[in-house]
Amino acid sequence: MRHQIENGSLTLEADTHGAELCSLRKAGGPGELLWSADPAVWGRHAPLCFPWCGRMRDNYFEEGGRRYEAGSHGVARDMEHMLSASGPDFLTFRLGWNGETLALWPWKFSLETTHRLEGDSVVTVCRVQNEDSRPMPFQLGFHTALRCPFTPGKAATDYLVRFEREESPLRVRCDENGLATGEETPVFPGQSAVPLTPGLFDDDSICMKGLRSSWIQLEEAETGRYLRISCEGYPYTLLWSKPGIPGFLCIEPWHGLPGRADLGHAFSE
């Protein structure tokens, strides 16, 4: 079920399914700022990645001598969350452990996600509580898909990705199955802006490590108008779209990486 809030500057909609942001509009702006989740292209808007990011080796992990099937990006994005609190400018969703979660993730937990409007910004805060009697490993990430182009009549190639400062990050390499290989190579050396070209994502996502910038923005080259995402405090940030950039760009701060192709199936690996 969708819920809406507004503050005079922004109007936001979020869904109890996955606690997912699904619409963002600016007053007087050109229209929708998030991807439409067209199922023929990519059927999501801005899913949360919890309790893991990316893929697991062979699509499963092992814990306590038991095998757990594991799809991409965790379980929270595909579960119904409860609207636990709301106000004129915020929505708080809660996902608590139950029989369904324990069948997929063998720890007791709660995940609380708050989306709040602050001026021209959306602030999302996730709080994870371990309610089990043993330590719980987990990862957390965001997979926000920005509409690109966000101005009617423009093309994706009219946009660029801008960093807060000049960067020379390392790219965490993944294999054809989306698993980390352990290899890291330089990417965007000495650059503060990266033009969006049709072939930029022909090799899938670009996972960056070692960024010094506190934000990354999708910027319209001609006008300087932008959509900015904070990545401060996150060890990894990914850029991703489908080949050809068919209407969206994801900027994804992650605490965590996909499984390793050369390691075992324990989650801690």
Identify the meaning behind each predicted range.
Residues 1-63, 67-71, 212-234:
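Beta-strand-rich N-terminal accessory domains
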Residues 18-19, 106-110, 117-123, 133-137, ...:
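Coil-to-beta-strand transition motifs
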Residues 84-91, 116-121, 150-154, 220, ...:
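A short, structured loop/turn motif at beta-sheet edges
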Residues 135, 148-232:
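Active-site/ligand-binding surface loops and adjacent short beta/alpha elements
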Residues 139-147:
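Histidine-centered catalytic micro-motifs
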